[in-house]
Design a protein with these regions (language model features):
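Coupling/switch/interface segments within P-loop NTPase motor domains and analogous charged loops
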Residues: 105-107, 278, 301-414
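Basic, Lys/Arg-enriched alpha-helical interface segments
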Residues: 1-93, 99-177, 520
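Conserved helicase motor core of SF1/SF2 NTP-dependent helicases
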Residues: 198-201, 221-238, 246-250, 257-263, ...
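Non-Sec secretion/translocation targeting segments of pathogen effectors
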Residues: 854-859
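Residue-level signature for tetratricopeptide repeat
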Residues: 709, 738-740, 753, 765-766, ...
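N-terminal pre-P-loop "Q-motif" helix
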Residues: 196-216, 419
Length: 859
């Protein structure tokens, strides 16, 4: 959400953006142009010139010197143009407007980015860079996009002092590619770097401001694409300022279940909030569980043996196969057979209820499994909404869970719920806490896991009277596809039981999905509300789109000919993904059609593509939906799980969505009826292009970036598929090692493989899993995205945190890692000189430097 780019030296380099009389904002189009063409230094020069024109008393220094021209805009907008002499083209133009003239200025919190005491700064929005001869058309496009409408029958005038002429309207050839949503980045700079920060909407800004001001538990619910992660990351400077003002040495914990999301947040903090980095720990839930066990119990849990909601499919299938082979209990075998095609229902009950729930009053004391009498009998200790099985089935499930616990011990596996439950006592006994705890994608967590994180937030008095914990939990109940049984109401109950005041806010603005997909989202939500009336009010939602793209929603007839065209030709595209219901369907398509671009819903959660094809997500569970439509009254139970799977699938699409369903289910009929003309039906296609999805191929860098996302989430087969089609540096090397990485464990070896091919950030994540913190620290010295000063600072901080002696480190790794030699040989003086700047917290820094000198002399 904030990015930093170094730029070359140029005139007026001593000026800081905070000293200027203007605030600059970049719309996403020009941001991409500047970034792709390395135009940071040219842009800064223009900004300084604009500032001088606005603030100078010199009559010769005015906007005319910048080729300033005014266009007659649309509605309340006034559109301007500036000359933009740059290294790519010295006759380009920038299309812009003043914030005060921007028709939708009240929708964005532009004021938040005024980093000066001068609150009267003018704000300027830069929209795009265009060729001189195309400026009128580009200004017209910008005006249309600002007003979110099309003007085929109007005329657009270009005006300056010398001439006035009418420009014929350019018809919109393809609305799907011409329309675009608008998001903005503020621009700040000093003499070393440029920082881009995403501008929050007023809605997002108001919600996070509430959390900072009230310092109370905060529930931030938000629909898919509403900017929940953006909002939580933006809190970091405010939280750090609060900690500093208190004179506290406490820290912030930012936790998620996704490795990919963890890496995204971590990079943003290092790049944009580096000065706050020492105040925040960014972890996956698995990270924090293993770290606490290692630090306080001196226990290294093999992370390849931990079963989580992200990894349960493979390991739980092993258990069910074992049970099928060894059990002589006919009731158990019959029950397993009954749910053979829906193993997730069995696992959900075990993981989310029998092992993952905390009872109605959040007071569970039994480890490994809830009390049998509470679960089997009709006890009020279990949340009513969680009771979806009959009593005889609950007896069988309880017995299966007991056998599962035994299987875990015998095979040296760990259930993440069991680890979290045991850590609750450790956290209380050792008084382990953070000043702030931020939980992203909270719907992915069970109650046991949430309660552990709740305990990590320090309980404290606020305003000298009420006790509280500063914990923010952000998520979306409609995206529960992991077996957690998450309910927002359960969080409210937790806070109520502790006597805490709390805030509960919601984000309903959708920035991801195009207009027609958003319409479909609302139709699906309305159907869920109608069919599951017991659904809690917090799960009911109506989405408001902030994406101006119309997009398309299509249904393609599921004929053999159409399926063959789609599944054999989809591999060539980096901009289209196919989502299927489970691994069996994915393997079937791969075997029959050679289809490599198919993903399960779980694999694709947290990711997005411009174009999504959804195949048989409704048809594969037709019997479930038929049951929903036949019954008059239903508990939400596991039914919401199937609706959520469909909702998550369709919301992965940024612009265009294609439905392929072999069965005409009642829910599909209702969706089609309510979409009406917004759904296009395609009877036959001859080529993949007949889907009319626009640009399909993408480029090599897109393929590589998608591959990296899957690699971070340890989806190696999917990562390999994209690496093999990319020609970016290291694509081939990464593709080669994907097969090796499918093996369990061996994290240290995997880290070495990644180090060998120069993937240092990736290598660091595997060294962390291997508990090899020496190599973990060394990786900082290889990260080119960090300045040398920052490399040293992170390196030494890690040594200090882990109690690693530099002398021992050099003896063990000096000959292998050349960067250690650099410290000793070439950079010892600079290290000494920078020691105060990098804020070394190592005891006896002078002794450390003395040891380095001795070793250098000895070499």
């Amino acid at each position: 959400n904030e990015e930093i780019y170094a730029y070359e030296d140029f005139e007026d380099e001593s000026l800081l953006s905070k000293d200027l009389g203007i605030n600059i904002f970049l719309e996403q189009t020009i941001y991409k142009q500047v970034k792709d063409n390395n135009l940071e230094s040219d842009l800064k020069k223009l900004i300084i010139k604009i500032d001088k024109c606005l603030t100078s008393t010199n009559g010769a220094l005015n906007f005319k010197s910048l080729g300033f021209k005014k266009y007659e805009g649309v509605g309340n907008n006034k559109i301007y143009g500036f000359d933009f002499n740059n290294k790519v083209n010295d006759s380009d133009r920038i299309i812009a407007c003043f914030v005060d003239d921007y028709a939708k200025k009240n929708e964005f919190d532009f004021e938040r980015y005024n980093n000066s005491q001068n609150k009267d700064k003018q704000g300027i929005i830069l929209f795009s860079i265009t060729k001189h001869n195309d400026q009128e058309r580009e200004a017209q496009k910008v005006s249309k996009r600002i007003n979110n409408s099309f003007y085929e029958h109007n005329q657009f005038k270009y005006v300056n002092e010398k001439k006035s002429k009418n420009i014929e309207i350019i018809s919109v050839v393809n609305k799907n590619t011409q329309e675009n949503n608008m998001t903005f980045r503020s621009l700040d700079f000093d003499d070393k770097q440029i920082i881009y920060q995403e501008v929050l909407t007023k809605e997002q800004s108001e919600q996070i401001h509430t959390f900072i001001q009230k310092s109370e538990p905060f529930i931030l619910s938000g629909i898919a694409g509403s900017g929940k992660t953006i909002s939580t990351v933006k809190l970091i400077p405010d939280m750090v300022e609060k900690i500093k003002n208190m004179g506290s040495d406490s820290k912030i914990l930012y936790v998620t279940f996704s490795n990919n999301l963890k890496q995204y947040v971590k990079e943003k903090v290092i790049e944009s909030y580096y000065e706050f980095n020492e105040y925040i720990d960014i972890k996956t839930f698995e990270d924090i569980c293993t770290e606490l066990n290692y630090k306080y119990n001196n226990k290294k849990i093999d992370r390849s043996r931990i079963i989580t909601q992200n990894t349960y499919k493979k390991n739980f299938t092993k258990f069910l196969n074992y049970l099928h082979q060894t059990s002589r209990d006919g009731n158990i075998l019959k029950f397993i057979k009954k749910y053979q095609k829906e193993k997730n229902i069995i696992y959900s009950e075990i993981f989310g209820i029998l092992k993952g729930s905390m009872y109605v009053d959040w007071d569970r004391e039994e480890k490994d499994i809830v009390k049998s009498e509470y679960y089997i009998n009709d006890s009020n200790k279990i949340v009513e909404d969680y009771k979806i099985f009959a009593e005889e089935d609950r007896e069988i499930l309880y017995s299966i869970t007991q056998k599962y616990n035994q299987w875990l011990v015998e095979n040296e596996y760990y259930d993440i719920n069991d680890i979290a439950f045991e850590l609750q006592s450790l956290i209380k006994d050792k008084n382990i806490n953070y000043e702030y705890v931020v939980v992203d994608e909270v719907q992915d967590f069970t109650e046991v896991q949430i309660y552990m994180l709740f305990l990590l937030a320090k309980e404290q008095e606020i305003y000298g009277k009420n006790k509280t914990r500063k914990i923010l939990l952000a998520g979306d109940p409609n995206q529960i596809i992991n077996p957690t049984f998450f309910k927002v109401g359960r969080l409210r109950k937790l806070f109520y039981l502790h006597g805490y005041n709390y805030e509960d806010k919601r984000l309903n603005e959708n920035f991801r999905n195009s207009i027609n997909i958003m319409k479909m989202n609302n139709i699906v939500n309305k159907i869920i509300n109608d069919k599951l009336p017991a659904r809690k009010e917090e799960d009911r939602q109506y989405e408001i789109t902030k994406n101006n793209k119309t997009g398309i929603v299509e249904q393609v007839k599921a004929s053999d000919e159409n399926l063959k065209v789609i599944f054999t030709q989809i591999n060539a595209s980096a901009k289209v993904a196919l989502i299927v219901s489970d691994d069996e369907k994915k393997e079937y398509l791969k075997e029959k059609y050679g289809c490599e671009n198919a993903f399960t819903i779980s694999e694709f959660k947290g990711k997005e593509f411009d174009n999504i094809i959804v195949y048989n997500i409704l048809s594969d569970y037709a019997d479930i939906y038929e049951e929903v439509y036949k019954k008059e009254s239903l508990k939400e139970g596991h039914y919401s799980y199937y609706f959520n799977r469909f909702y998550v699938s369709i919301t992965r699409a940024n612009y265009n969505l294609v439905l392929i369903e072999e069965k005409e289910t009642e829910i599909l009929k209702e969706i089609k009826e309510k979409l009406g003309d917004n759904l296009r039906y395609i009877e036959n296609i001859d080529t993949f292009k007949d889907l009319n999805l626009g640009e399909l191929i993408g480029d090599s860098s897109e393929l590589f970036n998608i591959g990296m996302k899957f690699f971070y989430d340890e989806e190696y087969a999917q990562a390999k598929n994209y690496f093999t089609r990319s020609v970016e540096p290291n694509s081939n090397n990464l593709a080669k090692i994907c097969d090796l990485f499918e093996q369990e464990g061996k994290y240290d070896e995997k880290g070495d493989e990644l180090f060998h091919i120069g993937e240092y950030k990736l290598a660091q994540t595997y060294y962390e899993k291997a508990y090899n913190f020496e190599k973990y620290a060394i990786m900082y010295l290889y990260m080119n995205n960090l300045s040398y000063e920052k490399q040293l600072r992170e390196f030494y901080k890690c040594l200090d945190k882990q109690g690693i002696n530099f002398s021992d480190l050099f003896d063990n790794y000096g000959y292998r890692f050349d960067k250690l030699h650099n410290i000793l040989k070439n950079k010892i003086k600079k290290t000494n000189k920078l020691s105060s700047n990098i804020g070394l917290k190592i005891k006896n820094v002078n002794q450390l430097l003395g040891d380095i000198n001795k070793k250098m002399n000895g070499r």
